[in-house]
């Protein structure tokens, strides 16, 4: 619907699929009656009967064909809504997780680190290799091994690299190579500090 004018209040549920900033404005215009559902991992539950179905993966037209089920998080205002959302979600996926709002917020933040920031790091690496005329295929095995460790939950124990080794000579050389990219340089410094802090004995 482009507008809630003339909305049928006898509907069982209304699925609000808009940007996060618009969700609660749209829900405020929906007449009382139907259960209200949104799809944001970061926003609170509706202030009326309903809930959240959050797909823990970006949905894009070019990735419509999936080799694995789309994981869905369910959070609801009450048991009745939770059951209804479960029935709806099962039409989409067999991989469901029931998380309360606090857990969902934590999961969303973890997803930003695991996916959004990770993807941005890959984009930086791809741009840097393009600028230095390196073939991206050089790094396929390295990236595959990194993600295999992540799937096993072993990322911390498998950490390698100059930051981990406190290799000052290499770190300084890398920072010198990033002088033309000040944002990347600051990110490099921050990531180096984070790695070294995480692996400093208590």
State each model region's role.
Residues 1-65:
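Rossmann-like NAD(P)(H) cofactor-binding subdomain of soluble oxidoreductases
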Residues 10, 29-33, 91, 131-132, ...:
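Alpha-helix C-cap/termination motif
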Residues 15-20, 36-40, 50-59, 72, ...:
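Long, contiguous hydrophobic alpha-helical segments, chiefly transmembrane helices and signal peptides
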Residues 20, 53, 79, 115, ...:
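Electropositive phosphate-/nucleotide-binding environments in soluble metabolic enzymes
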Residues 25-26, 84, 173:
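Phosphate- and divalent-cation-binding pockets in alpha/beta enzyme and binding domains
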Residues 37, 42, 48, 56-65, ...:
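Predominantly flavin-linked oxidoreductase catalytic cores and closely associated redox partners
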Residues 64-152, 198:
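Internal alpha-helical scaffold of NAD(P)-dependent oxidoreductase catalytic cores
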Residues 144-202:
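Interdomain hinge/lid region at the active-site interface
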């Amino acid at each position: 619907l482009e507008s809630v004018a003339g909305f049928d209040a006898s509907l069982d549920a209304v699925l609000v699929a808009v940007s996060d900033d618009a969700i609660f404005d749209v829900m405020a215009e929906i007449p009382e009656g139907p259960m209200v559902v949104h799809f944001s991992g970061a926003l609170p539950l509706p202030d009326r009967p309903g809930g959240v179905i959050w797909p823990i993966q970006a949905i894009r037209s070019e990735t419509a064909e999936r080799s694995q089920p789309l994981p869905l998080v369910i959070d609801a205002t009450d048991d009745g809504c939770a059951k209804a959302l479960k029935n709806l979600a099962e039409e989409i996926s067999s991989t469901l997780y029931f998380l309360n709002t606090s857990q969902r917020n934590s999961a969303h933040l973890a997803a930003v680190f695991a996916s959004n920031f990770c993807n941005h790091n890959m984009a930086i690496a791809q741009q840097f290799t393009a600028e230095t005329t390196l073939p991206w295929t050089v790094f396929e095995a390295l990236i595959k091994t990194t993600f295999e460790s992540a799937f096993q939950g072993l990322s911390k124990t498998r950490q390698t690299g100059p930051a981990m080794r406190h290799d000052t000579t290499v770190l300084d050389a890398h920072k010198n190579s990033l002088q033309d990219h000040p944002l990347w340089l600051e990110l490099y410094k921050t990531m180096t500090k984070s790695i070294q802090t995480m692996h400093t004995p208590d």
